[in-house]
Amino acid sequence: SGGFDFSFLPQPPQEKGPMGLMGPRGPPGASGAPGPQGFQGPAGEPGEPGQTGPAGARGPAGPPGKAGGVVGPQGARGFPGTPGLPGFKGIRGHNGLDGLKGQPGAPGVKGEPGAPGENGTPGQTGARGLPGERGRVGAPGPAGSRGSDGSVGPVGPAGPIGSAGPPGFPGAPGPKGELGPVGNTGPGPAGPRGEQGLPGVSGPVGPPGNPGANGLTGAKGAAGLPGVAGAPGLPGPRGIPGPVGASGATGARGLVGEPGPAGSKGESGGKGEPGSAGPQGPPGSSGEEGKRGPSGESGSTGPTGPPGLRGGPGSRGLPGADGRAGVIGPAGARGASGPAGVRGPSGDTGRPGEPGLMGARGLPGSPGNVGPAGKEGPAGLPGIDGRPGPIGPAGARGEAGNIGFPGPKGPAGDPGKAGEKGHAGLAGNRGAPGPDGNNGAQGPPGLQGVQGGKGEQGPAGPPGFQGLPGPAGTTGEAGKPGERGIPGEFGLPGPAGPRGERGPPGESGAVGPSGAIGSRGPSGPPGPDGNKGEPGVVGAPGTAGPAGSGGLPGERGAAGIPGGKGEKGETGLRGEVGTTGRDGARGAPGAVGAPGPAGATGDRGEAGAAGPAGPAGPRGSPGERGEVGPAGPNGFAGPAGAAGQPGAKGERGTKGPKGENGIVGPTGPVGSAGPAGPNGPAGPAGSRGDGGPPGVTGFPGAAGRTGPPGPSGITGPPGPPGAAGKEGLRGPRGDQGPVGRTGETGAGGPPGFTGEKGPSGEPGTAGPPGTAGPQGLLGAPGILGLPGSRGERGLPGVAGAVGEPGPLGIGPPGARGPSGGVGPGVNGAPGEAGRDGPPGRDGLPGHKGERGYAGNAGPVGAAGAPGPHGAVGPAGKHGNRGEPGPVGSAGPVGALGPRGPSGPQGIRGDKGEAGDKGPRGLPGGLQGLPGLAGQHGDQGAPGPVGPAGPRGPAGPSGPPGKDGRTGHPGAVGPAGIRGSQGSQGPSGPPGPPGPPGPPGAS
């Protein structure tokens, strides 16, 4: 058995019936020592830990409570939470089995208050609770209830400490772990730590905090729980407090404690960075952990943590890992924040926190917020940031180039500046190709384009027209047409395009031929410069704008990605050509742009002149963006450069910085989009066309090219998120891992009672008994299992008079506990067996109890020589055992005949309650009363039958049965209801004595 003395467990009522003989069940064996507690198990990720709460379950183990003490520290836990490690020990709490009791731990919730839990500190142990996480182990989970404690969990916050928590593992003791739940909380707060985590990895620690939380709590929990609980230990609560301590933890968590460090960052975890907490881990040993709880106080700081928010996610992530850092726990002090931890309660929830470990991250999680670290996390976003970089590609966005028309928007481009980066875009040069054009559209961003500005070149914008076209380029499609590039020429103007709008003029695209300029188109990106578009005047040509449709091609913009090209912007100088952009007006032809394919013209042909087309600016849809990129060739439009004057516009170029976006610059390639020139038609935007002059910029447009990307640049903003990147750290969280051993499962609960035994099958009719051989000594009864709850007993049947004993019928034995020794006495003839009463309902099976010791056997009456056993009749199904009727007087026992074959075992009926035992047969034949039966545990699963005792030596043989055949079975007395194990009905009349039965097997 679990080694537990279950006596404390309520025993189900034993109907027991006479059973009597049964012999007292021996005392249960001593309970085995509780198994070792399981390994605390690594702290769960803390973060989650909050979840941990669940760990609480483990609380059960708690009983060992141990926990209690365990809990104690909690406070420290603060960081030490780590120490939580020791928590492991908490594990033992496992035993706590009781821990279950820990359930009460729920009160742990109270733990909330637990904050005070600080005390909980001890809860700390709980930290170990963290481990409580382990609480997982908690399977006992129930204790988990305790998790409630977990509420205390809030304390959990301390959890951050929890980080330390990890150590919390120890928390494992988690049962405490129960507390663990608290830990949950912990995690949350811990989360902050998570912040830490951020760096946290530490943060992650937080996670540990998780556990911390847990732990924290855990401590509590578990501890308490079971801790104590003793089982009951209950302790409850765990002392919940301990957990509470957790609370303290909360504090810790409190934020962060993590943040604790960060303190404010708290959450932010940012600090999380503090991840340093990393160190956290170390503390783990702290095991003290619990202590930490107090730190938790610090937790106050935690509040600061909020800011941590920022980390929010970030932290979390990280931290989680950190959890281990839990050590950081110290920061845990911050835990003081613990209060915040309170929130931890929720941590309870954390139960799951188990994972809570994760919680570490959870920590943040706790913060859920990402809380704290998470905040940081955002930064992680930033990581994204980089992403934005990609956006650059968005350069493709260049597509927007079409927008380019909006080119004007370009101004916005300024932001593009940021794009500066875009320059890099320059590299985008290549972007120049078409994408640019798109960009052109981008242009607006074009402003960025201006970026192109960088391009100043923006002016190239004219080509920008191109750009327009570029946009068109977008049209790029055209671009595809790229060829359209021809118009692309316009494209050049395209840049202006941005003003492009004029891209429509891309129509001019017709001019497209200028397309060559289109080449310039690339500049188009600068198109954004297009803003320059002012010159839009040229826009008139914008008329061509219609062609803008072509702009669709802008599609091309895609190419924009190349934005990298953005660099290109330099080229923007070319913008001069932008003038050509005017041509853009020409753009009208832009429609022609479709021909874009002519893109080949790509020369870019000086056609820049086409710039005028810019006016067409209308922008074709350009949106397409498209392909145009290819049109890139249009770039030639350069000639359009004349427009360059507008180049001045180029100033806009300044925007160029936007260029950063320029990266998108690559979009610049959109310039190719120039072909989009058709967009030229967009030229109208062309007015912007004037921009055409900017077209000049166009050349610069080239740079502009970049510009377009610039817009992408806009995208840049996302960059910020990049910060989130930090989050990445989070990774550590892992630490949590330790969840610690699962803590031992607590010792097994007391064994359940043995379930009731099914009624025994009715015995087959016994053949006439042969002369009884000497009765072998009964084997020692096996230890009875604890009785399971027993079903209601059936009423006892009235015992029939005992008929003469027939041979004993051999029914399949019900599983029965060992029988008590049979008292001596001759068996009277068996009365009829009483009818079996209806079977009692089976009680729920109790835990299998340990087998009780067999009762002492009563003295064995001398058995008559066994007659041959009659054949055993088939076993009837077990009927419900009726209550046994009174036993009739037993007739003299005939010699036992040889034992007949056993009948088939009847189905076991439900075990009825044992009926009262009928009176025994008269002495002489009467069988001695059985010794008192030990309580029959309800039969759980039947215990194994003890080996039969050796059969005593055979008594003198009675006269041989006639032939040893089974005598007729005596009438079977009514079967008494089978009590737990009803006594065996009297034997039927003896058959002719058979030869002595063989000695019983031992």
Curated annotation (Swiss-Prot):
Keywords: Extinct organism protein, Extracellular matrix, Glycoprotein, Hydroxylation, Pyrrolidone carboxylic acid, Secreted
Residues where 5-hydroxylysine is found: 89
InterPro entries assigned: Collagen (IPR008160), Collagen_Structural_Proteins (IPR050938)
Segments of skewed composition (Basic and acidic residues): 649-658, 833-851, 908-919
Entry's localization field: Secreted; Secreted, Extracellular space; Secreted, Extracellular space, Extracellular matrix
Positions carrying 4-hydroxyproline: 10, 13, 28, 34, 352, 355
Compositional bias annotation for Low complexity: 17-60, 145-166, 211-232, 276-286, 330-346, 381-400, 505-522, 534-544, 577-621, 628-648, 666-676, 697-706, 760-787, 795-805, 853-898
Keyword Glycoprotein: yes
Glycosylated residue positions: 89
Tissue specificity annotation: Expressed in bones.
Biased composition (Gly residues): 266-275, 308-317, 449-458, 545-554, 686-695, 743-752, 806-828
Pro residues bias spans: 987-1002
UniProt PTM: Prolines at the third position of the tripeptide repeating unit (G-X-Y) are hydroxylated in some or all of the chains.
GO CC annotation, single: extracellular region
Region described as Disordered: 1-1002
Physiological role: Type I collagen is a member of group I collagen (fibrillar forming collagen).
Family: Belongs to the fibrillar collagen family.
Record's miscellaneous remark: These protein fragments were extracted from an ancient skull bone collected in Buenos Aires in Argentina.
Subunit structure: Trimers of one alpha 2(I) and two alpha 1(I) chains. Interacts (via C-terminus) with TMEM131 (via PapD-L domain); the interaction is direct and is involved in assembly and TRAPPIII ER-to-Golgi transport complex-dependent secretion of collagen.
Protein name as catalogued: Collagen alpha-2(I) chain
Organism: Glossotherium robustum
